[in-house]
């Protein structure tokens, strides 16, 4: 049994896969298995992954016979893993040199279910560079230890929560396999991180945020649309995926075989809902053209309750109005624009 299993779901974008895998296999720490799950790619991902498997016996390739989404790919890989610890990586990211030994040493010395470590954001373009500092702050864990019900209580809290990505975390192996055994057999893409983080947070006994641990190389802007404007269709798709994840979270919370038992499901589900609506509205505000905002808002309202969406609109009104009121020169272009936006919303 290897000390560590690393699961990498792969769908197209094969050009990044070798660097991802080699960032693991070229490390001094050797007691690791790498499980690549090819989700029925339409490019040469299977061939590239097969070559990586041929090069190193620690690499194992599993291929789906149909495209099933990220949740299913991660579930396949984790349930096939054998490691004492388990990690998940995205195929276009990497690990810093020496990260594996540091994580294993920390895990062996500090028993826990979830080990949350930090990132180095590698910006692929100008938009990514502009977003890098904020993303680094968001993905960097506080140095703390949480236990039992406090883990999920903190996870989605707006004041002291932690991010819901499943990568840049190491999990106790049996714990991760149990968590993914609870995962629904539904297609879910992108929003599966939040869904699984809720399950992890529910089942975990101990969470540790590791200080000074920028060991996950997060490639921001690679292969995504960071910095480009959204369309009405894309904002609707995003809201639909998030709403689907929230529905699946609710289904999980209704199960009668979840241990440990808890009596705060309503509050925890409210936390998740509020964070998802905040996310949708921030994307609407920041990345949807003004000409599409009205239609985009109507699409968001088909997935989320009007009172919560109005609460986010009020937040924008408050912020723009405050910026106008405290401006040194209320006749400046910036102040006038803030007043205009406050009135508009």
Task: Describe the residue ranges of each PLM region.
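Donor-binding/catalytic cores of nucleotide-activated saccharide
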Residues: 91-212, 216-235
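Membrane-interface aromatic/basic loop that binds lipid-linked glycans or pyrophosphate carriers
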Residues: 276-345
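Cell-envelope/extracellular polymer assembly enzymes that use nucleotide-activated donors
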Residues: 2-5, 33, 195
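Catalytic core of nucleotide-sugar-dependent glycosyltransferases
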Residues: 205, 214-222, 228-260, 279-307
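Short, well-formed alpha-helical segments that are part of the catalytic scaffolds
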Residues: 12-26
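Short beta-strand/loop segment that forms part of the nucleotide-sugar
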Residues: 31-40, 60-64, 90-91
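Glycine-rich, basic loop-to-helix element that forms the pyrophosphate-binding segment
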Residues: 64-81, 88-94
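A conserved acidic beta->alpha catalytic loop
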Residues: 23, 38-47, 66
């Amino acid at each position: 049994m290897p000390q560590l299993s690393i699961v990498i779901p792969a769908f197209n974008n094969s050009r990044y896969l070798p660097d991802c895998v080699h960032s693991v296999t070229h490390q001094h720490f050797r007691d690791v298995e790498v499980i690549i799950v090819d989700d029925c790619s339409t490019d040469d991902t299977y061939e590239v992954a097969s070559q990586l498997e041929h090069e190193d016996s620690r690499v194992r390739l599993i291929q789906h016979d149909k495209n099933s989404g990220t949740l299913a790919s991660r579930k396949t890989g984790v349930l096939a893993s054998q490691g004492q610890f388990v990690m998940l990586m995205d195929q276009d990211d990497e690990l810093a040199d020496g990260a594996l030994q540091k994580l294993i040493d920390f895990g062996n010395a500090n028993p826990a279910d979830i080990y949350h470590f930090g990132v180095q954001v590698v910006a692929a373009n100008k938009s990514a560079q502009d977003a890098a500092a904020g993303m680094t702050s968001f993905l960097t864990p506080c140095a703390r230890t949480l236990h039992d019900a406090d883990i999920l209580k903190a996870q989605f809290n707006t004041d002291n929560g932690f991010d819901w990505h499943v990568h840049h975390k190491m999990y106790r192996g049996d714990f991760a396999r149990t968590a993914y055994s609870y995962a629904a057999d539904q297609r879910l893409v992108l929003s599966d991180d939040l869904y699984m983080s809720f399950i992890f947070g529910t089942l975990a006994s101990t969470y540790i945020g590791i200080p000074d641990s920028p060991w996950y190389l997060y490639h921001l802007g690679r292969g995504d649309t960071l910095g480009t404007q959204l369309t009405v269709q894309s904002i609707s798709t995003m809201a639909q995926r998030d709403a689907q994840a929230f529905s699946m979270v609710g289904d999980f919370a209704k199960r009668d075989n979840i241990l440990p038992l808890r009596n705060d499901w309503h509050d925890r589900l409210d936390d998740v809902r509020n964070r998802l609506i905040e996310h949708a509205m921030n994307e609407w505000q920041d990345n949807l053209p003004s000409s599409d905002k009205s239609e985009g808002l109507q699409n968001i309202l088909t997935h989320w309750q009007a009172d919560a969406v109005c609460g986010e609109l009020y937040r924008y009104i408050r912020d723009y109005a405050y910026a106008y009121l405290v401006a040194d020169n209320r006749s400046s272009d910036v102040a006038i624009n803030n007043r205009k936006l406050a009135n508009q919303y």
